[in-house]
Amino acid sequence: MDIFREIASSMKGENVFISPASISSVLTILYYGANGSTAEQLSKYVEKEENMDKVSAQNISFKSINKVYGRYSAVFKDSFLRKIGDKFQTVDFTDCRTIDAINKCVDIFTEGKINPLLDEPLSPDTCLLAISAVYFKAKWLTPFEKEFTSDYPFYVSPTEMVDVSMMSMYGKAFNHASVKESFGNFSIIELPYVGDTSMMVILPDKIDGLESIEQNLTDTNFKKWCNSLEATFIDVHIPKFKVTGSYNLVDTLVKSGLTEVFGSTGDYSNMCNSDVSVDAMIHKTYIDVNEEYTEAAAATCALVSDCASTITNEFCVDHPFIYVIRHVDGKILFVGRYCSPTTNC
């Protein structure tokens, strides 16, 4: 959750949507080639591949792919290549067709939702490109009926509102909790998908109360809040929305503690025989939430260069909120903030 917190704090008033699963996969690839303090800092983000496989096996709506492209003239260490396995492929980064092929691979895998991943030609110094893409599409276990969707005011702030297409569902049982914390009060609800995933929605009691909740959104707190959920008959109202995101994560990750991972401070002596540095980490995302299903995709790439009770209540999402798509085992696939309907894609 720390990466989400950093991005959210630097993009006040904007929608945010990221995939921790995709980001962790790329950081894991970098970890395989890292040494010393660089490896130590990356180790907290190492993705256990069996966890990704578990999600993929138990929920056919979620799939992930990792690819590592290495410059054909570079000499990579056998220990690094063994860890990467069949994900590795040598390419000519100076050939414009290489970028086209990589973008096409991500485009096809994400069902056309991430295109292009790479907007500009790569530097001639590019030694390695690590890519992770994830795609998620799942139907609601209890779909919203389209006849109940209508225009409804969404309060961007206490004094400003815009109309949104609000989906509604009445008198259904969902896991729900009202949480009181020193930093603010809020409600949390679990909206399950068919299969082993669900969307958790965190809604502050106050229209302008989201920032303090974001600042305290840690993995520990999130697990605690989820453990407080109880089955409740409740009316649910949540906007239909689409959001896209594009981020260079270097500054965010440095602020999150990865101070010796990027630029000249990174030690990747377990990757190849020459001195290399990680100069960029690009993350692109897409999500579509509607009455029938949620569809989401994300792709991340790192450029390595030479040097989600019985009394009927109401849960009305009519002001900024946080949403998390997670697997039943607790793994967070996507996390986002929705606060600006006018910037839907």
Swiss-Prot record:
Induction remarks: Expressed in the early phase of the viral replicative cycle.
Site (Reactive bond): 306-307
Signal peptide location: none
CC terms in the record's Gene Ontology section: extracellular space; host cell cytoplasm
UniProt cross-references to SUPFAM superfamilies, sorted A to Z: Serpins
Pfam families from the UniProt entry: Serpin
Function text: Viral serpin that inhibits both cysteine and serine proteinases involved in the regulation of host inflammatory and apoptosis processes. Major anti-apoptotic protein which inhibits both intrinsic and extrinsic pathways and strongly cleaves host CASP1 and CASP8 but is a rather poor inhibitor of host CASP3. Prevents the proteolytic activity of host interleukin-1-beta converting enzyme (ICE) and ICE-like enzymes. Can also block apoptosis through host tumor necrosis factor (TNF) receptor.
Record's protein name: Serine proteinase inhibitor 2
